[in-house]
Amino acid sequence: MKPYQRQFIEFALGKQVLKFGEFTLKSGRKSPYFFNAGLFNTGRDLALLGRFYAEALVDSGLEFDLLFGPAYKGIPIATTTAVALAEHHDLDLPYCFNRKEAKDHGEGGNLVGSALQGRVMLVDDVITAGTAIRESMEIIQANGATLAGVLISLDRQERGRGEISAIQEVERDYNCKVISIITLKDLIAYLEEKPEMAEHLAAVKAYREEFGV
């Protein structure tokens, strides 16, 4: 685990974005941990979040021309990541996002920001069922752009309805790489360093045994 990944876990724990306990997911599964990126909700939170996304992007080595944030959660993420890339990595790249409803006056259309073209890096909080990615792909393809990759905050590394994860489905269906700031594996490595969290470690490992990929 890299220093920025450890720092991200501590940041998420400090903001209660990442919690341990017993949580019922939309899928009906009982999970020993829960991640709610919506709780990164202040100016300082967003500034820090952008730095972690930018760090993971640079670390991945993937090449891209533009950041795309799907509405709604992806919008602030794309914005803060673009700022962090410019301020901390000297990479001044365009970004854009979509509107849920197309506008019929003014600039019109369903995109805001830069023109959607070239190699697109899609940024979002998490991938649960991959629905947002599929909707975004329609927009990207309609504009003649290509998907360079997807960046999310956490990869839960768990099976979807079949034998593979929603993330593996996205990688297979769109022939792209999905990268994340942290994975379930990183989370377990972090818990292993913390004796006081042994109870959570056991629960997370048991969950991975049952649902992991």
Swiss-Prot record:
Task: Cite the annotated pathway.
Answer: Pyrimidine metabolism; UMP biosynthesis via de novo pathway; UMP from orotate: step 1/2
Q: Which GO terms describe its biological process?
A: 'de novo' pyrimidine nucleobase biosynthetic process; 'de novo' UMP biosynthetic process; pyrimidine ribonucleoside biosynthetic process
Broad enzyme group: transferase
Q: What GO molecular function annotation could you give as one example from this UniProt entry?
A: orotate phosphoribosyltransferase activity
Q: One GO cellular component term, please give it.
A: cytoplasm
CDD domains of this UniProt entry? PRTases_typeI
Q: Which residues are noted in the entry as orotate-binding? A: F34, F35, T128, R156
Listed binding positions for 5-phospho-alpha-D-ribose 1-diphosphate are: 26, 72-73, 99-100, 103, 105, 124-132
Enzyme nomenclature, EC number = 2.4.2.10
Q: Which InterPro entries match?
A: OPRT (IPR023031), Or_phspho_trans_dom (IPR004467), PRibTrfase_dom (IPR000836), PRTase-like (IPR029057)
The UniProt similarity line reads:
Belongs to the purine/pyrimidine phosphoribosyltransferase family. PyrE subfamily.
Q: What does this protein do?
A: Catalyzes the transfer of a ribosyl phosphate group from 5-phosphoribose 1-diphosphate to orotate, leading to the formation of orotidine monophosphate (OMP).
Query: How does this chain assemble?
Result: Homodimer.
This chain belongs to the protein called Orotate phosphoribosyltransferase
What organism is this sequence from?
A: Escherichia coli O157:H7
Gene name tied to this protein: pyrE
